[in-house]
Amino acid sequence: MKKLLTAVATALLIATPSLADPAVKGWKTNDSLGCMMLRECVDETWEISTVADMEDRLRYSNYDTVREETNAIIAELDKMGVKVYLASDKYFPRGHAGVYSTVSNQFFLNDSYADDPIQMLRTLRHEAWHAAQDQWACGNENTQIAIIHNEEEVPQGYVLAAEIAYGNSPVLPWEKEAKWAGGTPNMTLNMLRLINDNNGRPWDVKEPTPMTREWLEMKGCM
């Protein structure tokens, strides 16, 4: 339970440039990703409060099919103190559609993927699930994330998708359920509502996994 999400840790442990003059070593690298996540690079990043904010920035003009769920997820994230940003593709290493930071409680959507409303919503659900995992680790003031579901609950199709994407990476257990959430309408939204409706203590109404329970007890949250 003391492992950080590897993608986040990689981005945050690298040397980052100063606020005054961010000298990014290269775009579409972990260096540029970390600079953005630490908010030392803010050019071409835009805070998103509703779908309308994305429509102002992106070419695709019809987000009607995803508007309701997207707006609801962003509203629940706001209640948790999590900010959502749309950001230029230049910050993201190849294949990164989005990233969540357990340090700043912010996440960033790659504008080159967000231009497709279905892909955008899947990424939003996925990264917002990581925000929920952060809260399950005894509150999002920490830099840890917890597994919410027992691994055997994750449908096999999403297990395989995560294994293809992440291989034998230590983050695989977290990513399996995030993949599941990303592909399942309202799964992330319902979890965020459970968190907010219970004052940030979802474990009071939903039994945690054995390992997460052990962590919560160690931290004095149960």
Where are the predicted features?
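Positively charged n-region of N-terminal signal peptides that target proteins for export
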Residues: 1-4
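Bacterial N-terminal signal peptides
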Residues: 7-15
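Sec/Tat signal peptide C-region and signal peptidase I cleavage site
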Residues: 16-20
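Auxiliary, metal-adjacent structural segments of Zn-dependent hydrolase domains
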Residues: 21-22, 31, 36-103
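Stable alpha-helical elements in mature extracytoplasmic
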Residues: 69-73, 120, 124, 128, ...
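Short pre-active-site segment immediately N-terminal to the catalytic Zn-binding motif
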Residues: 107-124
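Catalytic Zn2+-binding segment of zinc metalloproteases
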Residues: 128-145
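Metalloprotease/metallohydrolase-associated module, dominated by Zn2+-dependent proteases
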Residues: 142-222
